[in-house]
Amino acid sequence: EEDAYVVSFKGTPRSFAFKDIKIQKPKGRLLKKLRFINDDDEYAIKVIDKNGIELIAIGIGNPFYATYEHIGYEDREFMGGPVSSANIEIAIPLEFKPELFIISKRDNLGKFKDFQEIVLP
């Protein structure tokens, strides 16, 4: 249970806004999501240092698709639906010194396209 930078964003499918960065113990749920990009990720956040070096790229799935986990919906083929905005948190090890976040989204061909840069204030 190590402290980490926990970075919060408010996002819509087309635009992310920086909310805050704290040093704290990430919640278990957040640590489970701290992973490299995989095929299920629609969105990713690249963490860049002051020298322009990519420290880590974190897959965040699709934060704009809410899944239903209610009793009575288990037999549905699609358990969820789109949402217009989401709060997004990522955890970054303290030895990294983030300066810039690059938000990218997968295009129709499955390639990630950067669509926004957010510099730490």
What function would you assign to each model-found segment?
Residues 1-121:
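Extracellular glycoprotein-like low-complexity segments
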